[in-house]
From Swiss-Prot:
Residues 202-287, 314-605, 642-752, 943-1009 form a coiled coil. Plant-specific actin binding protein. May be part of a membrane-cytoskeletal adapter complex. Residues 850-870 are annotated as: Disordered. Belongs to the NET family. GO terms for molecular function: actin binding. This is Protein NETWORKED 1C. It comes from Arabidopsis thaliana (Mouse-ear cress). The gene is NET1C. GO terms for cellular component: plasma membrane.
Length: 1111
């Protein structure tokens, strides 16, 4: 029969038996096809099983329906995996053929169409499927599937590359043939030769391009293989994790199956005991009825005893055999009872084991409470650190206010100094008014003074604006303080949430205690069941005694016959009842199977929740890894929080398992006591409890996330407070430097004003002015007398002498006027220097507050020339400090020709003057701080994971720097072009080299602009951490290049300033040859010595720069 069934199945399923041509090249295909074959075999076995009745067939259908559904589901998944793999493979082969066709259009035709099945390749491509990586199942992850598909594409491209290497030989052969053809056609026309040469050149270019593409393909293959190895390592790790999870699931399933088997055996034993009790009670009632009937019939049957005595002996022997059979059945019932007791004891042992597990869970809960208390202590420590930072901030604010008060007092002193300068200027104007010939120059001086007053008014307005800005910043500080208080309130709310978590934990402990009480009630119910069993045993013994009495009384024939008839009827009735009980047992078994399936579904949901929890924990770990570079204490706290979270999750999972086990025990006990309706109600209750636990778990996770976010906010606030403290320290140092400089400037002004007062008094006391007036009057008298006596010849020689004296006096008066003018200019220059120092200090404060370190480059020049030069010298000093801090390797803008031409200009030696010493130090410190903040912000910690926001901020700052550089380069170019338009021969070659360097700088800036745009687009689109790190490294290199460019452009700016200074000096040397100083005239110095000194002084175009001494 079995052979016939197999032959029938082969005939029915010939579509399956005849399709076993499995491929041998791909292990993945072999595994998938083997899985599909096993699924088909199981489905055929399930479908081939048959039954006698229709009800049996229906039962088999409802039993085997879920198995068939599972098999069909797995079959569908395997089919989907094969279809996706086929689609991916065809796409990869299409791409490979397109690239090969582009590289070798004459050798590799595109034959693989859209509807091909992977085998329609030409001789250039290997038709075999490549070897695959480790076996891939249809039920795996989609990431692993993509990795496997990657492996397929890599191996296929490798095969294509081999075919390309084989196909490269005919190219050279064809080239050789073409050359032979060219040799044969040498005697032909010249046009044919040129065409063939062009064709050969084009083919050689194509071959070179193809070789380059092959090299690029090899490089891409190596990269893809490296990525494949990394993905395989990740795949192996995931497989290990899956195997561990499957082993844990199998253990849990084995435990649940053992508990279900024990419960089922206990139920079966209880049902057998009940059946025996019902049988015994029915036999007792029937025996009592028979006894009454027998008593009634004894009188009637005494007459027929003699006749039926022989027959009674035979029937008595038969009855004895039947009683022996009944005794044997009773012995079997007793043995069954003993086995039921043994199983009952085993159930008690399991209950004791569960109680021990509950105790362990309680101990774990205590440990968790202790760890939570430790976490609270750590939170209090964090609060203390935050309060310390707030105190430091308040102290820094007090210091800042003190500095502001000092600045206000210095402003008052400056105002007094300005008033004194105004009074001095008025006195000087009064002294100059006495000289009649210098009125026009005095008017010019008054105009210049008016300009200065307007500039002073503008400076005062600027000071007022700055005070307004300071008030605004004070309001911002008040706002920040309010924000800090609000965050303190948030922290208190987090503490309240933590207390609610503790309350929830106490509630869970109370629930565990309630479960323990319920276990005690269950144990009492078991004791009651034991008492009932003992009572049943006693009733059985009583029934046995009564049966013995009945057997002694029923020796007669009629009684035995009636008894036998009744026994036969009872046996038939019992058989019918047994069949009904068996049907009930079947229904119970089906219900148990459905319950076990629901249990397995719940276990799978639990596993899914555990997997989600693990994914969340890994995500949290990644977030914590990003915060490693902040502080070591924070890492310790995060590690502790991790351990607490893991233990909490373990405790929660264990508590859930214990609750489920207790609920299962309850349901089993209620099974023994109640019917299936109670079991269904309990299942509904379990589902509700499971949903409530899920909700509680989600709430706890949300609260943990909130607390962690609040901790991160506190950490970020602490970092901002620390940065504010550092900025305030920098502010203090800079303000102290500026205050010292202003104090020194005030002292210098006071000393200069005192010396000027003394000079004025000396001039007033001296009689030189009186003598000059008298000489002028005498000269006028002589002139008038000369007009009256023009014809006298005897006085000619005297008049000539007087004219010479008059000319000398005029020259002296001019020298005195020029000396006064120069002195006033000197005073104005000193005033402008002080004002420029004030402006520089205030701008430094602004830059440090706003964070901009390059605003000093864009300041406009003042009204006077020396103010512009002083401002430019400050810029030069800052640029020189930046040149020293930058790398030695420049961006190589300057060409060799430019360097050789600029070497003739000489070296520049920098020596700060005493008055500007502190100013240059402050500028250098500020520039160094700004450059360090700009360049090294974010690059100090290479192990830290990269954030997208930081990369974009870095690129944005680089773009701003490039825009500033572009503006400065355009300004410098415009200056050079204006100098070239003037057509001066001074420094023409130097200006040409500077112009070439500026053009090269513009090209470099444009290249950096393009690189920055590409990096910004990549940073916005990329999501992978490794690629972001690469982008971050490229951005860091770009910032370094920008820094080098800045140093080069600053050097060019310095050279331009030097050339302008030399040019102005040459122009002045031409104009100022005819001037005579009053100082030289009064003290009798020679003009040559004074001019030499003046030329030496004017040759230096900056106060902090000196020319090198002559060797």
């Amino acid at each position: 029969m079995e052979i016939a069934a197999k032959s029938n199945s082969k005939r029915m399923y010939s579509w399956w038996w005849d399709s076993h041509n499995t491929p041998k090249n791909s292990k993945w295909l072999q595994d998938n096809l083997a899985d599909m074959d096993s699924n088909v075999k199981q489905m055929i076995k399930v479908l081939e099983e048959d039954a006698d009745s229709f009800a049996r067939r229906a039962e088999m259908y409802y039993r085997k329906r879920p198995e068939l559904m599972k098999l069909v589901e797995e079959f569908y998944r395997a089919y989907r995996a094969l279809a996706e793999r086929y689609n991916h493979a065809t796409g990869v082969i299409h791409k490979a053929h397109e690239t090969i066709a582009e590289a070798f259009p004459n050798q590799v035709p595109l034959i693989f169409g859209d509807e091909s099945h992977g085998g329609a390749l030409t001789n250039d491509v290997d038709p075999q499927t490549p070897d695959m990586p480790p076996p891939f199942r249809a039920r795996g992850n989609p990431d692993e599937f993509q990795q496997d598909a990657l492996g397929f594409s890599l191996s296929h491209v490798h095969d294509v590359k081999r075919n390309i290497d084989f196909s490269e030989e005919p190219l050279f052969v064809s080239n050789g043939k073409a050359r032979k053809g060219l040799n044969f056609n040498d005697h032909g026309d010249g046009k044919g030769r040129n065409g063939l040469k062009d064709h050969i050149l084009s083919e050689s270019e194509r071959a070179s391009k193809a070789e380059a593409e092959v090299v690029a393909l090899k490089d891409s293959l190596s990269k893809m293989q490296a990525e494949k190895q990394a993905s395989l390592a990740l795949f192996e790790k995931n497989l290990e994790r899956l195997s561990n999870l499957e082993s844990e699931v199998s253990r849990a399933q084995a435990d649940s199956r053992g508990i279900n088997d024990r419960a089922a055996s206990a139920e079966a034993e209880i049902q057998t005991l009940r059946e025996t009790l019902y049988k015994l009670e029915s036999e007792k009632e029937s025996s009592f009825l028979q006894y009454h009937k027998c008593l009634q019939k004894i009188a009637d049957l005494e007459d027929g005893l003699s006749v039926a005595h022989k027959e009674a002996g035979e029937r008595a022997s038969k009855a004895e055999t039947e009683t022996l059979a009944l005794k044997r059945s009773l012995a079997k019932a007793e043995t069954d009872k003993e086995t039921a007791l043994i199983q009952y004891r085993q159930c008690l042992n399991t209950i004791s084991n569960l109680e021990e597990r509950l105790r362990k869970a309680e101990e774990d809960a205590r440990l968790i409470n202790e760890r939570a208390e430790k976490a609270g202590v750590e939170v209090e420590n964090l609060k203390q650190t935050v309060s310390k930072l707030i105190k430091d901030k308040e102290a820094s604010e007090l210091q800042f206010q003190q500095c502001l008060n000092i600045i206000a007092s210095l402003k008052v002193k400056l105002h007094h100094a300005q008033e004194e300068t105004q009074s001095l200027s008025h006195e000087i104007e009064d002294g100059v008014a006495k000289l009649k010939f210098s009125e026009e120059k005095c008017l010019l001086l008054e105009r210049s003074n008016q300009n200065l007053h307007s500039e002073l008014d503008s400076l005062l307005e600027k000071l007022g604006n700055q005070s307004q800005k300071l008030t605004e910043k004070q309001t911002e500080l008040v706002k920040l303080w309010s924000c800090v208080q609000a965050e303190h309130l948030h922290f208190q709310e987090a503490e309240t949430a933590f207390q609610t978590l503790q309350q929830l934990h106490s509630q869970s402990q109370e629930e565990l205690n309630n479960l323990a009480v319920e276990l005690q009630t269950v144990s009492q119910i078991m004791k009651d069941m034991e008492m009932r069993n003992n009572e049943l045993h006693e009733e059985l013994e009583q029934a046995k005694v009564e049966n013995k009495g009945l057997n002694d009384l029923n020796f007669t024939m009629e009684k035995l016959v009636q008894k036998n008839l009744m026994l036969e009827k009872s046996i038939s009735y019992l058989n019918s009842e047994l069949e009904s009980f068996r049907r009930k047992l079947k229904t119970f078994e089906e219900a148990c199977q459905s319950l076990s399936e629901e249990k397995s579904c719940l276990i799978s949901e639990n596993q899914h929740n555990v997997i989600e929890n693990t994914v969340l924990i890994e995500w949290l770990r990644q977030l914590r890894l990003e915060a490693v570079g902040i502080a070591t204490e924070k890492t310790d706290l995060e590690g502790k929080a991790k351990t607490i979270g893991d233990k909490l999750t373990d405790a929660e999972t264990e508590n859930l398992q214990l609750k489920r086990n207790l609920l299962s025990i309850r349901s089993e006990k209620h099974h023994l006591e109640d019917e299936i309706t109670n079991v269904k109600d309990q299942l509904h209750e379990k589902e509700k409890e499971f949903e409530e636990i899920k909700m509680e778990k989600e709430k706890l996770i949300q609260e943990v996330f909130k607390e962690r976010k609040q901790v991160e906010l506190w950490e970020s606030q602490a970092a901002t407070f620390f940065c504010d403290k550092q900025i305030s320290v920098v502010h203090e140092t800079l303000i102290e430097a500026t205050t010292r400089e202003l104090a020194e400037a005030c002292k210098n002004l006071e000393s200069k004003s005192a010396s000027r007062d003394a000079d004025i008094e000396k001039l007033k006391r001296s009689q030189t002015i009186v003598l000059l007036n008298e000489s002028i009057k005498s000269l006028e008298d002589y002139v008038f007398t000369h007009r009256e006596s023009a014809g006298e010849v005897s006085k000619g020689a005297d008049l000539m002498d007087e004219f010479l004296k008059l000319e000398g006096m005029c020259l002296r008066i001019k020298a005195i006027a020029e000396a006064i003018m120069e002195k006033e200019k000197f005073l104005m220059l000193e005033n402008t220097n002080t004002y420029s120092m004030l402006e520089a200090s205030l701008k430094q404060i602004k830059e440090l507050k706003t964070g901009g370190g390059r605003s000093m480059r864009k300041q406009d020049g003042g009204s006077g020339r020396m103010r512009k030069q002083s401002h430019e010298t400050e810029m030069v000093m800052k640029d020189i400090v930046l040149d020293q801090t930058s790398d030695g390797s420049s961006y190589e803008i300057v060409s060799k020709k430019g360097n050789s031409e600029l070497d003739h200009l000489g070296f520049v030696e920098l020596k700060p003057v005493k008055t500007h010493k502190t100013e240059t130090k402050a500028l250098s410190e500020e520039s160094l701080i700004v450059e360090k903040v700009e360049i090294f912000d974010g690059f100090m910690d290479p192990n830290r994971e990269v954030n997208k926001r930081r990369v974009l901020e870095r690129l944005d700052s680089d773009l701003q720097k490039l825009e500033n550089l572009q503006i400065t380069v355009e300004d410098l170019k415009s200056k050079v072009e204006t100098v070239e338009k003037e057509k001066t021969k001074v420094g023409e070659n130097e200006y040409k080299t500077i112009k070439g360097q500026l053009e090269e700088g513009e090209e470099a800036i444009e290249k950096l602009f393009t690189v920055n745009r590409k990096l910004t687009t990549k940073a916005e689109s990329e999501k992978d951490i490794d690629r972001r790190r690469r982008i971050f490294e490229h951005a860091r290199r770009g910032t370094e290049k920008i820094g080098r460019l800045q140093s080069e452009i600053q050097r060019i700016q310095f050279l331009l300033m030097k050339l302008e200074g030399e040019r102005e000096h040459r122009l002045r040397s031409k104009i100022s040859d005819t001037k005579v100083l009053l100082r030289d005239y009064i003290y009798g110095r020679t003009r040559s010595v004074s001019m030499k000194k003046r030329t030496k002084k004017r040759s230096v175009f900056c106060g902090c720069v000196q020319q090198p001494e002559s060797p």
